[in-house]
Amino acid sequence: MKIVLAYSGGLDTTVAIKWLSETFHAEVISVSVDVGQKDDFKKIEERAYKAGSAKHYLVDAKREFAENFALKDIKMNGLYEEVYPLATALARPLIAEKVAEVAKKEGTEYVAHGSTSKGNDQVRFDLALKTALDNVKIIAPARIWKMTREDEIAYARERGIPIKTESSKYSIDENLWGRSIEGDIISDPASEVPEDAFEWTAVRKQDKLKLSVEFEKGVPVRVNGEKLDPVKLISLLNEEVGSRGFGRVEHLENRVVGFKSREVYEAPAALALIAAHKDLEKTVLTPLELRFKRHLDSLWSDLVYQGLWYEPLRNTLELAGDEINKWVSGEVKLEVDLKSLRVVGRTSPYSPYSEKISSYNKGWYPSDEEARGFIEIWGMHSLLTRKARYG
């Protein structure tokens, strides 16, 4: 029996290698997927083999994650509950797909992951695996073994599994698009998040940053005039924007599994690019298009967060989003100061803005007769209804 395990290199999945091997008398094959996290994958591979992995795979999926997931998040202004740019939620389907590919290659239908029974990730992993692999048999050790962190450490020591035993206050998950932070005082929503929880947005530069981002059909392609591939562009903004303290999210989040959770994220590039993209949309779209697009964005964000990446409606929403984004091209100028970002200018060949029409100093003015006629017709529904109801 072979079991393919989605392996992060952390305590849970390291213990899972040995636990799966002992519990199911199985050959465990570990798979690590690089979606831009700042990990030492050589050490992760060594740790997997020391824990008992029969074979280890490392899959480089950074470019695919950037192009097929992060860029979609920009085009759809993907912010769950209007604040969270979905970094973890976007990565899980791709990781599951890569793990499923290894399972097919190894000729097994048994796949394992390290998600717990109270997290969102179990939903995302399970649904993605069920989509990617026919007749998949999913094993989630953390949903079965009921071990605490201390139990896991003791289990590892008893079996000679080398692990880092020093206690970390925070549980971290990161990829190219963002970093999530959990644990310790963060669990108390009344307490301020300590500065030592932040890494990407720890203030390292005090100077004001001005930069421009150019979009083509809703996709960022240049920063300060330099054409960059998506991975480099996102990485650059994570550093330049994050080093000035911008990119933090803290809120009470409504989880898929039925309760509220205090969540803290860092996503400098994601938040900067979505802010710029939304501003450019506002520059080129009609009021009705904007209203419609905001509805698309909200629904798309909910589907992704809730693990419904393979829901057919997502494709429909993206088709509509792509049609609208055909006109979202231009340049947005940003200013990043200490822990803040604002749009300071924008241009687009598709902007209907006319200074001749909008300026109060010169140009077009409706006549008194035109203004009176417009106002009379514009307010007629309200005026007639109010008169009918209240006299």
Curated annotation (Swiss-Prot):
CDD domains assigned: ASS
Cellular compartments per GO CC: cytoplasm
Pathway as given in its UniProt record: Amino-acid biosynthesis; L-arginine biosynthesis; L-arginine from L-ornithine and carbamoyl phosphate: step 2/3
Entries under InterPro entries matching the protein: Arginosuc_syn_C, Arginosuc_syn_N, Arginosuc_synth, Arginosuc_synth_CS, Arginosuc_synth_type_1_subfam, AS_cat/multimer_dom_body, Rossmann-like_a/b/a_fold
Keywords: Amino-acid biosynthesis, Arginine biosynthesis, ATP-binding, Cytoplasm, Ligase, Nucleotide-binding
Catalysed transformations (reactions): L-citrulline + L-aspartate + ATP = 2-(N(omega)-L-arginino)succinate + AMP + diphosphate + H(+)
PROSITE patterns: ARGININOSUCCIN_SYN_1, ARGININOSUCCIN_SYN_2
Annotated L-aspartate binding sites: 116, 120-121
Positions with a binding annotation for L-citrulline: 84, 120, 124, 171, 180, 253, 265
HAMAP family in the cross-refs: Arg_succ_synth_type1 (MF_00005)
Official protein name in the record: Argininosuccinate synthase
UniProt organism field: Metallosphaera sedula (strain ATCC 51363 / DSM 5348 / JCM 9185 / NBRC 15509 / TH2)
Gene designation: argG
